[in-house]
UniProtKB/Swiss-Prot annotation:
Keyword Transcription among UniProt keywords: no
Family: Belongs to the UPF0046 family.
Subunit structure: Homodimer.
Recorded consequence of changing H67 to A/R: Loss of phosphodiesterase activity. Disrupts metal cofactor binding
Keywords, comma-separated and alphabetical: Cobalt, Hydrolase, Manganese, Metal-binding, Nucleotide-binding
Activity regulation: Inhibited by nmolar levels of AMP and GMP.
Gene: Mpped2
CDD domains named among the record's database cross-references: MPP_239FB
Protein name, entry field: Metallophosphoesterase MPPED2
Length: 294
């Protein structure tokens, strides 16, 4: 496949033959297509916080998976904050309010947020099925009354919340989606394959910055303990073959913190918490040239 060049014409993504086995998919495409090989695909060193922002650029500050552990995070200078989900433990309204208060004290011009699998109350279908599924698994969430969480997103008064939706700020077209492959029945979990692809098909071409909670296949998605890749194949194909954003920010896999590129799109796993839920991974900054006319 071509690297460094936006896709031309209408591209239709279909379910990948290796969709259900991302580790096998990675091996297959690496061997047969060199899809994850240098020089195009490589790690990107973090930008030091004291690096001057280039003229005519916007600085993005990327974080994810803070899990109600924001008190000790040292936030760097920037223009736009991107948080790609799991800002709470369970999505309890009290947690959301605390997070919103923290956002309110940050100086960024725009703060854009999506949900993750831990924001249970943001997933209406999940909440509707919670009692039927396993009442005792999330007792503090199960005890909530519908009026407590029906409009929980409205508590995020200090940010722009995206859920299968987009916003344009400072000329950048930004799209956010919370969905991840099924994992132990948390919020916004969907089966691999067509169910997730249907969500990725909603991402418009022309998106500059994509925010998802989980990673695409092959980019910061390795789980050492399981010796497995866990990224979504359909998300990778959507990003590389159809949407071609300049920046794809995500989290979800705490072990995958860091930045990579495929020669065109920059991929940032901004997970703040480590695998042991310690909020020690620093925010990642990234500068993009301002769109023409912005």
């Amino acid at each position: 496949m071509a690297h460094g060049i936006p896709s031309q014409g209408k591209v239709t993504i279909t379910v990948d033959e290796y969709s259900s086995n991302p580790t096998q998919a990675f091996t297959h495409y690496n061997i047969n297509q060199s899809r994850f090989q240098p020089p195009h695909v490589h790690m990107v060193d973090p930008i030091p916080y004291d690096t001057p922002k280039p003229a005519g650029h916007t600085r993005f500050v990327c974080i994810s998976d803070t899990h109600s552990r924001t008190d000790g995070i040292q936030m760097p200078y920037g223009d736009i904050l991107l948080h790609t989900g799991d800002f709470t433990e369970l999505g309890l309204p009290s947690e959301v309010k605390k997070f919103n208060d923290w956002l309110g004290n940050l100086p960024y011009e725009y703060k854009i947020v999506i949900a993750g699998n831990h924001e249970l109350t943001f997933d209406k279908e999940f909440m509707a099925d919670l009692v039927k599924q396993d009442y005792y698994r999330f007792p503090s969430v199960s005890k909530l009354k519908p009026e407590d969480f029906d409009n929980v997103q409205s508590l995020l008064t200090n940010s722009i919340y995206l859920q299968d939706s987009e916003v344009t700020v400072k000329g950048f077209r930004i799209y956010g989606a919370p969905w991840t492959p099924w994992f132990n029945g948390w919020g916004f979990n969907l089966p691999r394959g067509q169910s997730l692809l249907d969500k990725w098909n909603l991402i418009p071409e022309g998106t500059d910055i994509l925010m998802t909670h989980g990673p695409p296949l092959g980019f910061r998605d390795w789980v050492p303990k399981e010796l497995q890749r866990v990224g979504c194949v359909e998300l990778l194909n959507t990003v590389q073959r159809r949407v071609r954003p300049k920046l794809h920010v995500f989290g979800g896999i705490h072990e995958g913190y860091g930045t990579m590129t495929d020669g065109y799109t920059t991929y940032i796993n901004a997970s703040t918490c480590t695998v042991s839920f310690q909020p020690t991974n620093p925010p990642i900054i990234f500068d993009l040239p301002n769109p023409q006319g912005s």
